A protein has these predicted regions:
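N-terminal low-complexity, acidic/polar interaction/targeting segments
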Residues: 1-182
C-alpha cells in the first residue's frame, strides 16, 4: 500500500518490474501501485515517483526509494506488455480541513502508539494537508483499513477514521506494553 506523501522503499527483482522501472527512469514518469488481495486488484491506487535508485545489483535487480504522489482510479487496464498498464484518472480531495482538535488528537494518539510499539517515527507536521496518510502510512495498520482511507476523498473523514482506529487499538497496545514491563 502506498499513500500520497509517504516514502516506500522497493526491491525490484522480477524481470517485468525491472523493465517497468527502467522505462519510468528513462521517461521520468511515475508508476502506479494498487492493492492486490484474494478478492482481486483494487480500483483505487497511488502513483509513485522514483526518488532515487539506492542500489544496483549485477543481475539487474535494484533497490529504489519512491514516494506516493496522487491517488488515482483505474478506468481501463491494458495487458499487452509484461507489466500491466492502465488509463487512469487522478482523484482530488474535497475542499476543507479537519478541525484542529482532531488533528491534535490524531498526532497525540500516533505518538503514543509509536512509543508503545517501539516504532521510531518522526511526528508529521500537524499542518500537512495529507496528515491522515502520513500517520497511517507510518504504522503497520490493517490493509483493508488503509484501502478504505485511500478511497476516501475527504481529509477530515480520513483523519476521523484514523483517530477511531488508533483509539480502538490503543488499549490492547497498552496492555501488551504493561505485560512486557512486568
Amino acid at each position: 500500500m502506498l499513500f500520497p506523501g509517504v516514502p516506500l522503499p522497493l526491491h525490484i527483482f522480477e524481470p517485468r518490474y525491472k523493465e517497468m522501472i527502467a522505462e519510468c527512469l528513462d521517461l521520468k514518469t511515475p508508476f502506479g501501485i494498487l492493492r492486490a488481495s484474494s478478492e482481486g486488484v483494487a480500483d483505487i491506487g497511488c502513483t509513485a515517483e522514483i526518488l532515487e535508485v539506492t542500489k544496483k545489483y549485477d543481475d539487474g535487480r535494484m533497490d529504489i526509494l519512491t514516494r506516493g504522489v496522487d491517488r488515482f482510479e483505474v478506468l481501463e487496464v491494458h495487458e499487452d506488455r509484461a507489466f500491466l498498464q492502465a488509463e487512469i484518472t487522478l482523484i482530488q480531495d474535497e475542499p476543507g480541513r479537519p478541525p484542529r482538535q482532531m488533528v491534535e488528537q490524531a498526532v497525540r494518539l500516533h505518538a503514543e502508539i509509536a512509543k508503545l510499539s517501539g516504532t521510531e517515527v518522526s511526528g508529521p507536521a500537524e499542518g500537512a494537508s495529507n496528515l491522515s496518510f502520513l500517520l497511517a502510512g507510518s504504522l503497520p495498520l490493517d490493509l483493508d483499513f488503509k484501502q478504505k482511507l485511500l478511497v476516501t476523498s475527504s481529509e477530515a473523514k480520513r483523519l476521523e477514521a484514523v483517530v477511531g482506529y488508533l483509539e480502538a487499538i490503543l488499549p490492547g497496545l497498552r496492555r501488551a506494553a504493561k505485560a512486557r514491563w512486568n
